[in-house]
Regions:
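Feature recognizes metal-dependent phosphohydrolase scaffolds
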Residues: 1-42
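Core nucleotide-handling region used for phosphoryl-transfer chemistry
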Residues: 39-375
Length: 375
């Protein structure tokens, strides 16, 4: 006897043996109970109230409260232990009005570097990416969010995790410096009417220089994202049109790649040590395929000087580093020999720690040394 979900209206199948031989018999069940379908409970299909409960119950997610609004972000332990699931990837620059049960502002779901995760291994991308794919220049600053604050009829300006603190303050200062009062008012009205967040890369060379040096501080509008749990955003052309209306600088589309072969060739070209985009060094690229799937690439110049920043901090503090075997290139060894001497200055505590300044000093000293050698 074989049951084919007979309890849910299927058939009971059996074998009957009689004088005429062996026969298969199926008896259909017309009296049955409907199956109880277990729906997958995820943050993308739940109500906002359910999401709040779910996020608060996750030990890898940190909540910060600002009156009725809370920010939810993955913890450093989640990052270090690579605890990535639908909740921890969602909790990145996510602001929820927990009193009204609505999203107040939001950034991207977390996405990963090529080769950082099993699903982003380069060889896996051939089957993962849906072509054409678009590459956008990845500027090197900190993430900033601008939405509508209905409680104060003002802009809600936030960093990735807080509406207080220095980063939110620097972002606010930058907005009021770069955007006219009229356009600030227009942005506020636009964010309110369309229930969206302006997502920025804030390059602040005065307060927070990163790895790539810029001639001046600037704001780059990355995307306009809907204030909802399910991630959705304006398309690139609509985002650019809106940016230009408000006097903002949109992110730069670098290229569109129609096939895997085009992507493959481009990928290995940009990984060259001396690669520059339109004559300048950049952090990397964000890749977005035709379905919205995103991954990113960090380039050689950025990776090298990010590593040398760590070397610098240890060398200035101690006068040496423990693992000199990590210095695998002539440039790395030359820079290390230079930067460790800063430990012996009269006041090493006041030596700049940002790599942009240190790198500039290093090259200036190298140029001067070359000039002296010619005399």
């Amino acid at each position: 006897m074989y049951k084919r979900q007979v309890e849910y209206g299927g058939e009971l199948r059996c074998v009957q043996v009689d004088a005429d031989g062996i026969h298969e018999v199926e008896i259909h069940n017309d009296v049955f109970k409907a199956p109880e379908i277990q729906e997958e409970q995820t943050v993308t299909t739940s109500s906002v109230a359910d999401v709040i409960i779910s996020l608060r119950g996750n030990r890898y997610i940190q909540e910060k409260t600002f009156g009725n609004i809370s920010s939810f972000n993955f913890t450093s332990k989640a990052f270090n232990d690579r605890v990535w699931d639908e909740q921890t990837t969602k909790a990145r620059g996510l602001y929820i009005d927990t009193f009204k049960g609505r999203v107040a502002a939001r950034a991207y779901d977390k996405f990963f570097n090529i080769n950082e995760r099993p699903e982003t291994k380069f060889d896996m991308l051939q089957n993962k990416l849906q072509f054409p794919v678009t590459a956008y220049v990845k500027e090197n600053g900190f993430l900033g969010l601008v939405s509508y604050d209905e409680y104060n009829d003002d802009l809600l300006i936030a960093s990735k995790s807080t509406i207080e603190g220095p980063f939110a303050g620097w972002l606010k200062d930058m907005i009021y410096e770069k955007v006219t009062p009229e356009n600030i008012e227009n942005m506020k009205r636009f964010a309110k009417d369309n229930n969206v967040t302006f997502v920025f890369e804030c390059v602040d060379m005065k307060h927070d220089p990163h790895i790539i040096e810029y001639p001046e501080s600037n704001l780059y509008l990355l995307d306009i994202v809907y204030n909802q749990i399910n991630y959705a955003k304006y398309d690139y052309d609509a985002m650019c049109d809106t940016a230009h209306r408000f006097g903002l600088t949109p992110k730069k589309k670098a290229c569109e790649l129609a096939t895997w072969q085009e992507f493959y060739d481009w990928y290995y070209d940009i990984l060259e040590d001396d690669y520059e985009y339109n004559g300048r060094v950049i952090e990397g690229f964000v890749i977005e395929d035709s379905t919205g799937y995103m991954t990113k690439i960090k380039l050689a110049y950025y990776n090298f000087w990010k590593f040398m920043r760590t070397i610098s901090h240890e060398a200035i503090r101690n006068g040496y580093i423990k693992k000199t075997s990590a210095l695998t290139t002539p440039l790395a060894n030359e820079y290390y020999a230079w930067v460790r001497k800063l430990h012996d200055t009269e006041d090493p505590a006041n030596v700049p720690r940002d790599i942009c300044t240190l790198r500039r000093w290093f090259y200036n000293d190298m140029k001067q040394a070359e000039g002296d050698s010619l005399i």
